[in-house]
Amino acid sequence: MKKSLRLIAAISLAATGLITVAILPSGAAAHKVTCYRLVANKDKAGKFSGHCPKGWSKTKPKPKPPVVGSSQGTNSSSDIDLVVPSNVSLAINGSSFDAPLVGVTTSGSSAYSAGGKVTFSAYPAGGSGSGRTGITNGSLNIGFSDVPMTAGAGTLPSGVTEANYVQVPYLLGGAVVGYNLGGGFDNLKLTAAEVADIYNGTITQWSDSQIVATNGGASSTLGKALTALGTANQPKNTIKVLYRAASSGTTEAFTYWLYQAGNSGIAPSGGSVMEGSGGAWKATNIDGVANNAGMAQGIDNTLGSIGYVEYSYILIPGNAAIDVAQLQDKNGQWISPSLTSIGNAAAAAGTSVTPDNFAITDEAGNDVWPFATYSWAIVPKSISNEATCEASVKYLDWETHYGQGAFAKAEGYVPLPLSISAYARAQLQTVTSSGVECLTQSS
């Protein structure tokens, strides 16, 4: 006699396609369990032998609220299951370079929350060093650093094994050289050698003949204005050098650019700390500031100053009046910073950027900003708590895909190239909890 068939799934919500209807032989149904999961934010039901596999549940999940900005993303993460198994809080800290984007994606109405299950600590922007230290001592769930944590970069804490951590590009930006000479000094040009000489104390005045020559000579409008600073003995003619007093990945990118430019006496700041007078930099009229926000404020408040700051900070209302120097590209052309010129640098570098090959300096091409940088998010490769593991890597996957188009450009960053987003996902898929991958694909 033919085995009778038994309907085991309801037809409710069939019009919207929210529940999959399955028809199985009644004899087989006794050995299977009904399990559910969200796929593309819709319920999907399935039958499995004995128990629900990872990513499925006997409890029917509720569709998540729409992720703010997800439809605007340049990259897609729709094939990644963003469900988090339980409520979880994540501790975060690190690079001030990242602060604007971290802020908008972890707090407020635009934040990633996985349907309200994920909350983030406040982001104090303590600097890249604090991000690396916090992730290795266990006080953070996600650390952020402009410079990846590697022995080659001199940023690997003592006793730490690099292979125990996964590092992914979080955002793409560029550092700029800002200055404050008051009005009448727009479009100042500085060579890498001149910037190095300023920080080494060789050039101490804005009226220096080398700077005047770079800016059209003594007969040019800008050259005359610079020369007049010295002739009139104006206080702002004395260059006030500003540097990052705490561990800073922006400092690392800045010093690496100068090092790559071939300036004698310049080397990448291995610990990403630029020391003051008598230390790594020989300038004597020098002051330290806390972070990128402090650097922008310091330049804005100090006549005669020079400093280096992440590009997005000069776009913040209140900082927009900061003058930014033009720099030379690899072809010797004078370039102004923009999302386009920073993006061109990343495009020229291609997909070769990894934690062991992270610098983007003096790439070939037209309108290429001479030093751009990826900032990195760091998580342990093995995380004991399953919910923490899933929340950490799913947030980072969401941010490196959806978050790029929705938020990165608006905050003054260049959206990650698609190839870099794919690289980030591949790395995140190696993070596990109890040997099980935490970034699971929908099916």
Where does each model-flagged region fall?
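Secretory targeting and sorting signals
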Residues: 1-27
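Processing junctions and N-termini across compartments
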Residues: 22-24, 29, 45-46, 432
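Secreted, propeptide-processed cysteine-rich mini-domains
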Residues: 29-41
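Conserved beta-strand positions that form and line the central face of beta-propeller blades
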Residues: 34, 51, 91
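Extracellular/mature segments of secreted proteins
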Residues: 40-67
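Flexible loop/hinge segments at secondary-structure junctions
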Residues: 63-443
